[in-house]
Amino acid sequence: MHIRDAQATKGRILASAVSEFAYHGYAGARVARIADAAQANKSMIYAYFGNKDQLFDAVIDAAVGGLHVAVPFTPEDLPGYGARLFDFIAAHMVEVRIDAWRRLERPAVTSLEREIFAEKIAALDELKAATGATFDSADLLVAVLALAWSWVAVPAALGSLASGDVATQRERVVQSIEALCSAIMEPRA
């Protein structure tokens, strides 16, 4: 008799779902392909994750949670945070693809996403209170994220015309975040 390891099966299903959603998007992903790749019965997907929507949410939460752990938010060092985020993005294109598909096909946020971004905004609010600056915390976070994601978000044609390698692009992102922070971190009189 073969004893099934539920956690291992669930992990294989999630890993297979990450790949399937990254390469086919939500609409193109097939539960049967996920089950085959995970070497699991299709019914186990429904038992562990509910339905395709919930499985996609689990994939998003895994990607967001993994990024949150791998790239700790440092409001007191936003250029450093931007650099680490840039590095993570450059090294994890599967997660970038999942995020792109999510934006196209399922723009609703998960509760984990909302919680993580609320924590970051609260940390920036604390920094703002401590420094006397008057920036809008959500706007600042959006700008830092946009700069860190910029090189994967621009059209390929534009990226091909830009000078410099990945290290140069990274340095430009850091310099841009430094300039932004310098401009808005000063307390207003």
Q: Regions from the language model: what does each represent?
A:
Residues S43:
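Key DNA-contact positions within bacterial/archaeal DNA-binding proteins
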Residues H68, P72, R106-D139, E171-A179:
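Amphipathic alpha-helical packing segments from all-alpha helical-bundle domains
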Residues D57-R84, F117, I121-D125:
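Amphipathic alpha-helical linker/stalk segments
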